[in-house]
Amino acid sequence: MDQGRLQEAESIYRELIAAGTNNHIVYGNLAALCGMQGRYSELIKLLRRTLEIKPNYPEAHYNLGLALKEQGDLTAAITSYNKALQLRPNYPEAHNNLGNAYKDQGDLTAAIASYNSALQLNPNDPETHNNLGVVLKKQGDPTAAITSYHQALQLQPNYPEAHYNLGIAFKEKGDLTAATASYNKALQLKPNDADTYNNLGNALKEQGELTAAIDSFNKALQLKPNFPDAQWNSALTMLLGGDYKNGWEKYEWRTKGEKEHAKPHAIPKCKQRSGKLDLRQSDPLLLVTEQGLGDTLQFMRYAIALRDKGISISLCAQPKLHPLIKASGIDPSPLTPKQANQVTEGEWMPLLSVPGQLEISPSNPVFTNPYINTKEDLTKKWVDILGEKPHPVIGINWQGNPQAEKAGLRGRSLALEAFAPIANNTHISLLSLQKGFGSEQLDTCSFKERFVSCQDQINETWDFLETAAIIGNCDLVITSDTAVAHLAGGMGKTTWLLLHKVPDWRWGLEGDTTFWYPSMRLFRQKDQGNWHEVMERVAEALQKQFGSTAMPTEPTSPPQTSAKPQPIQDILAPISLGELIDKITILQIKTQHLQGAALVNVQAELNALETTLNNLQLNLDPTHIQRLKQVNQDLWQIEDDIRDQERRNNFDETFIRLARSVYQQNDQRAAIKKEINTTYGSVFVEEKSYQQY
């Protein structure tokens, strides 16, 4: 068998079994032969016979677990791995594969525990470090995942899967340069991997390198022609770059493959329209919405365009949009997805297939007139509620659905506090159009008094039809890339859209206007993530349009010079490794307690420091970081407790104990930092001096 003479070996083992042997090694080796040839059903049968002969055989239980997992029976596989570990607790391979089974089952906590058990027994196994990183990333901790991947790569530098996974984690953290480098390294080691080319293309696209991105997607498609993810990502990149002809064609891949990037909200029983739409057809056509509310608001206009061409059109849409659809004359009786599922007559088509059918492009917009309306009585209602407007009313909206941002719209939202330069203009009043996610920022906003007096009443209004009436009473809408942008744009309302540097495909990379909405003006980031510069431009544009009087500020000492102060640049100074990790853990704790602009600032600093640490590519002991973070968490709580005692004017023994615990915790903190510096050979070290008493 060792010489590869598999058939001969199998014949010998079967002859022994036919002769009546009851030897567990014979059955086990024959099972191994079957496994090498992918004959898992036979493998499982033979392993079970092996265990009947010798129940306390850990290797057989382990191999049975591998076979059961291969066949998709995760529960049975977990049982087999656990039996192997009962017989041999110090079995790192069993712990590792038990972690894999738990991961596939979705029990990430149990998976992490299993991987850690494996690493305690065999800390030099790169595969387990890589597997742990995958689960940590799934848990939403890309920083810890990056540490695990670096540990795997220190043990095995030419480990393509670890480089690939490292790229995924870097991309999730927004470090696109590092992600690109990791994907390229993975491709040097494994040049024929379509998934890596696809992910590299996405990282390049998000950096605005569209030609290189499309080249990467094409390489993925050369390796795997019917690769839905690469086709879909290529479509988005082409559309972003203005290649509408090829982009719309590839956009049809969105409903294919396991992921189904844009699943229709209903699957009617009638025939789905495929191929080019015949504009002379007599059969009714049902358009079925897909993706988000903003997509429906943007593309439902084409129901009107098709109806104008003589096609009998009906629309299935999200129920919360039905009153708006009716009032806008798009469909007097829109269907819910549940109703659309029962339609048997005519044909149906996903809504976002229509732009490709109509060959929509900047030179052929087909439909640019305002197409969204509200009810006149609702508009009058909000005229009365808002009352006499002493200043122009600016409707603002700052955040979209966080889940959508994770899926591919990263960076489109900004904090409410970023609107502070606008709020400083006393010639305007602000009106929040924010609903749901992000609306809690109103409670801690530094310019709360700048909102209209009826803001609380507006906050309670969730109906799109009524929101349209409120927008109708605004003089201008300023919004990030959310459904509100499409609602206001579809109404023909003057709208200023705030876009991050590489936005969603529909906005392109250049220009301050868009053919989708003639009433819209685009304000683009010049530097990725820099909303402050964008909002300064918006504030200047507001001043030109409505005039400005700055908000009064507290009197200050007169300046010593008339020269305009320059902003302080990032200060770069060497520090010890322990100090760097200490600062990172403090910022991680702050992210759990802060919100609004403060959270944005802390997250930016945290990302910068974590990137610095990751670039060192150290094989850090996670316990150092965990211990230091725990001490800083304890210090945070102690400070809260001390402030609480002081607020109550309580300076008893409890206060004294808490005060003493501060320096005790700081001594422990210094000791851990010194241990880190000593362990990793930091040039700078931790020193403390104590008052003798």
What do these predicted regions represent?
Residues M1-A563, F651:
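Alpha-helical solenoid repeat scaffolds of the TPR/TPR-like class and their adjacent stem/linker regions
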Residues K564-Y693:
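Extended, charge-rich alpha-helical interface modules
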